[in-house]
């Protein structure tokens, strides 16, 4: 029986996908066996960033160069990523969590169910308060929606209460959370969600989760 959980992390360029994974791994790597697979079209920039900045050793981080549409590599033809998962499991048979970061994408990104057991979609306040109500599969179907960079709301004229209202309407009961990853605000809520809904720990919902 498979003992590890694959967590897909998607979202637009610059929303904070890599930052989220970097902060998460810093907090949980001492508690769980973790590995990361990143996707970039022509480079391994995200993998290199994580290698330099996360607490994970380099052999636990693998970069996949998709060479084309990032949608395809996580959905229609996930073979490169599935091979990367197999290689990571061969390296670390005890692995418990594998984060798979998609290439920067739009609001329609979704993971193949063969590739991700649960999905996190990251958007950010700097894109404007209208982003949640634009919908798209990433916002409406992901298991957890992360709305990052709350500290920028005053500078871009975004009303967080409007974003909360719209996200609640679009998500139809599915959880979402506001974060400021620069200061680790509500990072504990994301960790709590992973423990409860990915690792199936018998714990309460984090207080920072919104439904």
Swiss-Prot record:
Pfam family, one: cobW
InterPro entries the record matches: CobW/HypB/UreG_nucleotide-bd (IPR003495), P-loop_NTPase (IPR027417), UreG (IPR004400)
Binding site residues for GTP: 11-18
Database matches in SUPFAM superfamilies: P-loop containing nucleoside triphosphate hydrolases (SSF52540)
Single biological process term from Gene Ontology: urea catabolic process
GO cellular component: cytoplasm
Keyword terms of this UniProt record: Chaperone, Cytoplasm, GTP-binding, Nickel insertion, Nucleotide-binding
Keyword Glycoprotein annotated: no
GO molecular function term, any single one: nickel cation binding
Domain of life assignment: Bacteria
Subcellular location: Cytoplasm
Subunit structure comment from the entry: Homodimer. UreD, UreF and UreG form a complex that acts as a GTP-hydrolysis-dependent molecular chaperone, activating the urease apoprotein by helping to assemble the nickel containing metallocenter of UreC. The UreE protein probably delivers the nickel.
Function of the protein: Facilitates the functional incorporation of the urease nickel metallocenter. This process requires GTP hydrolysis, probably effectuated by UreG.
Entry's family note: Belongs to the SIMIBI class G3E GTPase family. UreG subfamily.
Annotated protein name in UniProt: Urease accessory protein UreG
Annotated source species: Actinobacillus pleuropneumoniae serotype 7 (strain AP76)
């Amino acid at each position: 029986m498979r003992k590890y959980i694959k967590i897909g992390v998607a979202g637009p360029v610059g929303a904070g996908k890599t930052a989220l994974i970097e902060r998460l791994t810093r907090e949980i790597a001492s508690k769980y066996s973790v590995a990361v697979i990143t996707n970039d079209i022509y480079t391994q920039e995200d993998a290199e960033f994580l290698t330099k900045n996360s607490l994970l050793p380099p052999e636990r981080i693998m970069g996949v160069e998709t060479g084309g549409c990032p949608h395809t590599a996580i959905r229609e033809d996930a073979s490169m990523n599935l091979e990367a998962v197999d290689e990571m499991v061969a390296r670390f048979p005890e692995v418990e969590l594998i984060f798979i970061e998609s290439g920067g994408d739009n609001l329609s990104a979704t993971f193949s169910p063969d590739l991700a057991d649960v999905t996190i979609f990251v958007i950010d306040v700097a894109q404007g308060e209208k982003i949640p109500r634009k919908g798209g599969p990433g916002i409406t179907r992901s298991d957890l929606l992360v709305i990052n960079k709350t500290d920028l709301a005053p500078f871009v004229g975004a009303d967080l209460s409007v974003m909360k209202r719209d996200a609640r309407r679009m998500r139809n009961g599915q959880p979402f959370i506001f974060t400021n990853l620069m200061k680790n605000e509500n990072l504990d809520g994301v960790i709590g969600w992973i423990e409860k809904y990915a690792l199936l720990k018998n714990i309460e919902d984090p207080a920072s989760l919104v439904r």
